A protein has these predicted regions:
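Basic, polar low-complexity surface loops/patches
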Residues: 1-102
């Protein structure tokens, strides 16, 4: 199964293991914070975000410029969120953009 994952998906899963169980990982991908898998299923109705799929993987996303309002919705719903930001410029990154929990 791990061989079927893209480098970005492997990066996401590695970062997901760094946060407390049950926390929703908001993963910066370009102009959006994306949520995948169970995080997307849980977060999409709270955030009013459309649940879609990339392959068989559930996902939803919110625009990065509106992050504070979406974080407030998760917190009001009693959820914990972890932010994962791009820590290098995607235009100059060689290969996968480095990301860290911030």
């Amino acid at each position: 199964m791990a061989d079927e994952l893209t480098p970005m998906q492997r990066q996401y899963l590695a970062l997901k293991r760094e946060i407390p169980p049950g926390a929703i990982l908001m993963f910066r991908l370009g102009d959006f914070y994306e949520m995948f898998g169970e995080d997307a299923v849980v977060a999409s109705p709270i955030l009013g975000a459309t649940l879609s799929h990339r392959g068989s993987q559930p996902m939803c996303g919110v625009p990065h410029h509106a992050l504070n309002s979406y974080l407030a919705k998760l917190i009001r719903a009693g959820k914990t969120a972890a932010l994962c930001d791009q820590v290098e410029d995607p235009k100059t990154a060689r290969g996968l953009v480095r990301r860290e929990i911030t």
